[in-house]
Amino acid sequence: MRCGFCSLLLNEVPADWIAREEHAAAFLPLPTSSLAPGHTLVIPTVHATGIHEASASSLAATMALVQKVSLAIRDALGAPGVNLLSASGPGSEQSVAHLHFHVVPRWPDDGFTTWPSQRSRHTVVESPAQLLANAMSTADVRSERSSERADRLRT
């Protein structure tokens, strides 16, 4: 079964499209899900469940469109700021299994908050900085493998 966002991309379900490019697309969420006027979802056009599965090139195109949408929100709606929200993978509260970024317009004193009011209960015994630095030393290799895997899935 196809994911809901892939169905939108294939025009099986109507959407309020803001932009459709070769590698990324942007649309408004359903009115009942909108967090603010102009709240926009930006997705890669090639299915990736989350950020871990997306190819570097797909992610770059998606983020370039996120920036264009952010500029349009500022210029057209007068929102001086935006929040970028994304959830990816188990435990993240990801609502649709297709990588997506919420671009939420923000105005001073809009009454909206995005920061959690409490810290995570999860603990890591070792130094998170050291663990992440070690993982990053091999991240380029993993990223290349992930991109190659995504390229194979497209062909």
Question: Model-found features: residue ranges?
Answer:
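HIT superfamily nucleotide-processing domains
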Residues: 1-155
